[in-house]
Amino acid sequence: MTVLLLRLAGPLQSWGVKSRFTVRATELAPTKSGIIGMLAAAVGRRRTDPIEDLLSLRFGVRKDQPGRVIRDFHTARTLDGKESMPLSNRYYLADAVFLAGIEGDRALLEGLDEALRHPFFPLYLGRRSCPPTHPVSLGLRETGLLDALRAEPWLAAQWFRKQHRHDPFDAELLLDQEVVQEAALPAQERGAVRGSRDVPASFDPRRRDYGFRQVERLTARVSAPEPDPHDPMAELSADAHDPMAELAADDHDPMVELEEANPCS
């Protein structure tokens, strides 16, 4: 079994499943349709091109840094200023970091790995306004999808890891249910299952439709990578004096009430 791991991080992400008209919601983790769209863009496929080979890939994601939901109240007017366009609420995930994995044929994954490093079309995290930071591709792993997501070092930002340095961090895993079933986990390690309508039949605007998949929720205890003993910057990066730490841990967050009043998933 071969797995391609992806690092999905950026200032903003938005992974819509239920977005309609003036409300553009986001899920709290990357969707399979969003990742397939990113892969298709990387290899240079048009919206009308077939995606059956990409649909065969099995998908899972680990929430290394969940981020928080923010809302953009979006207004627009015509060029002459005489007519207002419909108002919209657009939701995003801010400061989130995810580890995603796709499992499938090695030859296909090798091509996708290369394409993500040199994409044909620009990559984005759900919406065109959400470019990723690099690297996106973390390369191939010769193991199963569940094991790959469990074993990879924690990708969270240093400020987030510092907030959890005294307590273990259990990251949420969301995987295609068939992956978990094949792993034959004990019953006590199994998680809740829900349906997700994020399997694209096609990206063709003339017949765009989505199917359901079953997603199982697990957890994985993660830890930061061991520092390189030969890295002269290691001591500096581990400096206990972080001038931003108090801001990052600020109890007064003006967005909290907004998020609670406008849940979107």
Model-predicted regions and their roles:
Residues 64-265:
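Internal, well-folded beta-alpha domain core
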Residues 2, 17-81:
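Glycine/small-residue-rich interface belts in oligomeric ring/scaffold proteins
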Residues 8-14:
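Short polar catalytic/cofactor-binding loops
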Residues 12, 58, 97-99:
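Structural motif
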